[in-house]
Each structure stands twice: as C-alpha cells, then as structure tokens.
Amino acid sequence: MSQSYINVIGAGLAGSEAAYQIAERGIPVKLYEMRGVKSTPQHKTDNFAELVCSNSLRGDALTNAVGLLKEEMRRLGSVILESAEATRVPAGGALAVDRDGFSQMVTEKVANHPLIEVVRDEITELPTDVITVIATGPLTSDALAEKIHALNDGAGFYFYDAAAPIIDVNTIDMSKVYLKSRYDKGEAAYLNAPMTKQEFMDFHEALVNAEEAPLSSFEKEKYFEGCMPIEVMAKRGIKTMLYGPMKPVGLEYPDDYTGPRDGEFKTPYAVVQLRQDNAAGSLYNIVGFQTHLKWGEQKRVFQMIPGLENAEFVRYGVMHRNSYMDSPNLLEQTYRSKKQPNLFFAGQMTGVEGYVESAASGLVAGINAARLFKEESEAIFPETTAIGSLAHYITHADSKHFQPMNVNFGIIKELEGERIRDKKARYEKIAERALADLEEFLTV
C-alpha cells in the first residue's frame, strides 16, 4: 500500500490519541473532524476530546483496573493522560479534570503537532486505499454509520447513554451540604447533600413519576449499566438507589452538622454527591445522576435535593444513542478490520466503554496503524496487561451476547499458582505483573 500519510477520522478521545501516537512515530496524519462544519446535539464546542458525560476518568489507584490502565497508558506516552494530569481537579481518589481546560489542551497538543493536519470536514465514505483509523464515536454521522453498518453485515448494536446535570456552585445552599470524600479517602473533594428517610422517599416518588423525554417509537430502551439514567435506577427499586449513586456509607455527618437527621444516626439515610466540574470550582455535576427527564422535570425533581432548592442548571442532563460494532466478528486484536485490512477502528464504537478505555483503544489502533504503514509486525499487547486484556475481550467475546465492556480485573489473565484470597493483595500482584510484562513487551 503506497501512501504518504494515515487518515484518522474523528477527534474525540480515541481519535486524538490515535493521531498523536501515529505522528509521534514520524508519520504524517490527516485528522478529520466534522464539528466546525456539522455539529452534534451533545457536543458544546469544536474542541477535540470533549467530555460529554462525566468529567471523571475514575479511580487512580493500581488496585483499581482503570487505574492500572491509566498507568500503562502513561508509560506509552498517552496525550490524553498527559492532558488529564495537567488539568485535574480535586476528586478524592479519582482523576477528574476541568472539562473545558482538558479538551482545550488536547486540541492544542494534537492540532499543533507538526505532522498532524486537521481537516474540518465530514467523511461519508470508508476509504479503501489509505490506512485509516475510524474513531467517530457513538455519535457517528448517519452517512458514515450506514457504511459501517454495511461492513457489519447490517447487524448493528446500540444502547442509550446519558449525562448528568451541571450546577452553578453559587446557587447551592452551602449550609445544607458538607465537604467530604467517602471514607475520607484523599482530599475532601465532594459536596454531600444528606437526606433523611422521609426526604429520600419523597424524592424517590417524585423521580419515578417524573416525565421523561420521548425516545423514537421504533427503538427499544437499552442502557449500558455503567451510565444508566437515574430515573431508570429509581424504577428498579429503592435499594438500587441506596446501594448505587445515593449510598451513604463512608459519608457520616460532620460534627458541626445542624440540619435535619433521623434520630441520633451518624450517617444519613441517603446522600447525593456533587463533584467539581472545572478548575475554577464554579461548576459542580451531580454524581451518578445522568438522566433523560424533560428539562422542566429535572429542575422540579432535582431541586428537592437538600441545598439545591434554588440551584441554577448550566446544563441539563441529556441522553444519546450509542452504536457499536460486532467486534468479535469484525476486528483483530490490534483493532484492525478483518474485512477491510486498511481500516482500524477505535473508541466506543468498538465496544469498549468509558473515557479511558476509548483513549486506550485509540492508542493501540494508532500504534498498529503506524506499524502497518512501516510494514512492521503488528503489536498485540499481552493479555496480562489491562490494555491487552481489553483488546482481547472485545475481539474474542461471544458475538451473540456481546455488550460494551469497561476494563476490570475479571478480563485480565489470572495469576498463575495458588489464588491469593485477599482481593487487594491479588490486585496489587496483577498490577505488578502487568507493568512488568508491559515493560518487557516494549523492549522486544
């Protein structure tokens, strides 16, 4: 295949990472992004790697699978991780970022790379004669989605994804909330709105009876469990809320708390957490409260949360349809297409779920697109690593039951020898082996 550059289509998390990895290997890149020419309902700017759901990249500890994945990506020179570290905001033991600052930094690093040419245009055909990484994400334009759908033998998959509302911090009644991280882990990074049992029951009733924005009549409601609308959780029952986004454990009242409580209990019946959304600390999002309620209903119901009675919503929660491929049948472990070998796919459309996972898939696809360009052997990352196990899972899962997957220790190859019973010790050992195997892999 004679060519002088590689195409990358889509400048989200996966596409930005793929383009950067290719360019860092000395290969010119044409990075296509349709925003600027054609917008989507969910994106607010034309910047690359815009975060449309949460601003959290989740846990940072190596005993957390996504923490291990992030460490592997750091060692591989990830532009997404570098930008995230530079724009992080307080979030306890998690890595959360200033939403706008993060996407702006990624845009600057990628667009200003001397080997990357940014083309603001919509691509409607799958290239056949140029090595191309397709990372158009869950919001792929209809024209291109149709071509990918055909590659998929017409058998597309989808689920619904939702985002949480964002609030102006100056409109929160600080006398009714308190600053604390669960179990006092890390710095006190979350505002906590405690509820008594009666307050929770009233809130739950209002939530389950609130009016949702309509879906297309021909589409079934299918949700990814990790980003399920709060009203759907509420309809599953009270315990789903109390063991999910509103769980109170580890969030005891502070000694100086004077608000309402149930008797002498030291822990609230339920807690709503708010997490800082930008570096200035002027915006907070409601953690786990992704929603598809009508906007008027969001205001009515969420203003029942203590401290949010007069809250101003700078962005209401929204929901969008995510499409993904039959990766077990369509992709190699390198994210290369089995049916059209000049194509690589990356991001949520491949069935990886989550910001970090999307960027990781872009990193692997970019590395392998560059290796194909240079006529080098493909790089299949070890299944003992988080990055390798994720690539292996989405390309080897049972196609009939394939659903999007977050990185987790369950998909990473088991340790050899006797099973370590202590979970933390076992995860530490898996992480230690993963990083050692990654270093060895990179030296070969």
From Swiss-Prot:
Needed cofactors, names only, are:
FAD
Q: Could you tell me where this protein is found in the cell?
A: Cytoplasm
Q: Which residues bind FAD per the record?
A: 10-15
Reactions mediated catalytically: uridine(54) in tRNA + (6R)-5,10-methylene-5,6,7,8-tetrahydrofolate + NADH + H(+) = 5-methyluridine(54) in tRNA + (6S)-5,6,7,8-tetrahydrofolate + NAD(+); uridine(54) in tRNA + (6R)-5,10-methylene-5,6,7,8-tetrahydrofolate + NADPH + H(+) = 5-methyluridine(54) in tRNA + (6S)-5,6,7,8-tetrahydrofolate + NADP(+)
Q: 4Fe-4S: is it a keyword of this entry?
A: no
EC class name:
transferase
Which is one Pfam family of this protein? GIDA
Q: Which InterPro entries match?
A: FAD/NAD-bd_sf (IPR036188), MnmG-rel (IPR002218), MnmG-rel_CS (IPR020595), MnmG_N (IPR040131), TrmFO (IPR004417)
Q: Name one GO cellular component term.
A: cytosol
* Keywords annotated in UniProt: Cytoplasm, FAD, Flavoprotein, Methyltransferase, NAD, NADP, Transferase, tRNA processing
Q: What main location does UniProt list?
A: cytoplasm
EC number per UniProt: 2.1.1.74
GO biological process, any: tRNA wobble uridine modification
Keyword tRNA processing belongs to the record: yes
Which GO MF terms does the UniProt record name? flavin adenine dinucleotide binding; tRNA (uracil(54)-C5)-methyltransferase activity, 5,10-methylenetetrahydrofolate-dependent
Role summary? Catalyzes the folate-dependent formation of 5-methyl-uridine at position 54 (M-5-U54) in all tRNAs.
Identify the HAMAP family for this entry: TrmFO
Q: Which family does it belong to?
A: Belongs to the MnmG family. TrmFO subfamily.
- Name-wise, this protein is Methylenetetrahydrofolate--tRNA-(uracil-5-)-methyltransferase TrmFO
Origin species, per record, is Streptococcus pneumoniae serotype 4 (strain ATCC BAA-334 / TIGR4)
Record gene name: trmFO
